[in-house]
Structure formats: C-alpha cells, structure tokens
Amino acid sequence: MIKGSKAMIETINQYSKTFKEPIRKSRTSCRGIVIKDNKILLVHELNKDVYMSPGGGVEQGESFEQCCRRELMEEAGLDVSVGEHLFTINEYVFDELFISNYFLCEVVGVGEMALTPTEIDHGVTPEWVDVEKAIEIFSHYKEKTPDHESLYLREYTVLNKFLEQ
C-alpha cells in the first residue's frame, strides 16, 4: 500500500475461537488513528481497564467520515480532519460480525466531549499513550476475556500494520 493512496484498503478477517455461525447481528463502525509526538490517542474505559481506538457505530444516513469525526468529538473532544481509510477489520465473535473501518486522522481543533450514559458508566477517558506502550498493552490480548481478547487483537493488529507502512 502506498501512503497517501486511497486505492487500496487492506481488509483483515479475524475469527474468535468463540465464533459460531450463523451470524445473527452485525455492526459497522469507524475508528480514528491519531498520532501526535509519538503518542497515539486511545480511549480508556477506566471501570474495565480496557483501551481501544476512539470510534463507534455508523448511524443511519451517516458517511464513514462523518461517523469518524462525530465519534472523535464525542469521545475525545477533538475536531479532526479524516484522512486515508487504512484498514477494515471484520471481527467474527460469538454469532456477531463487527466491521471496523480505521482512518488516519489529524487534530484540527478542540471542542466538547459528549459521552453517552454507557460511556460515562464505563469511565471513558481519552488518553495520549506512547506508541510503544500501546503496542505492549494490546499485546496481552490472550490474557483477556473472549470479547476483550478480540478487541485487543484487533487493536494490536491495526497498530502493528499501521507502523509497518
């Protein structure tokens, strides 16, 4: 893949050991990769001690770019310019398919966070984490519960593939 080229979006299929057909539910989301001063923006759910890239589900009538901008504002209070669509991860967990689209984003402004009640309950907090520390955090995916194992493997895969470019 050539950096800056939107022609090739790498698609990765990831199957959890818990996956069982048929797929009964699917969810499409967009996530932002935001790097600044060798730190990556992550969302930390303090109550579960779970990290992930900021992002969330695409709402009806919303483009991927609109979803990514909205989610970064809601979860981190950041206005971003949405760049290249880097990766699509198809996560097969239990009887569900989670489709995560990752975009390279750049901060262009600061606004107000607007967390959902669930995100508030989970203690969602944006954190700038050293890239090497983020890789180390996500490398422990095998030590997680099945749903978090898949999430951490997804994040570990994306971060490593991004750094290979």
Where in the sequence are the language-model features?
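Unchanged
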Residues: 58-81, 90-141
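Acidic, metal-coordinating catalytic segment for phosphate/diphosphate chemistry
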Residues: 2-31
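Nudix hydrolase/Nudix homology domain
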Residues: 49, 120-165
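Conserved Nudix-box catalytic region and its N-terminal flanking loop in Nudix hydrolases
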Residues: 35-74
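Active-site beta-strand termini and strand-to-loop segments that position acidic
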Residues: 34-37, 105-107
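Residue-level detector of beta-propeller blades
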Residues: 45, 82-85
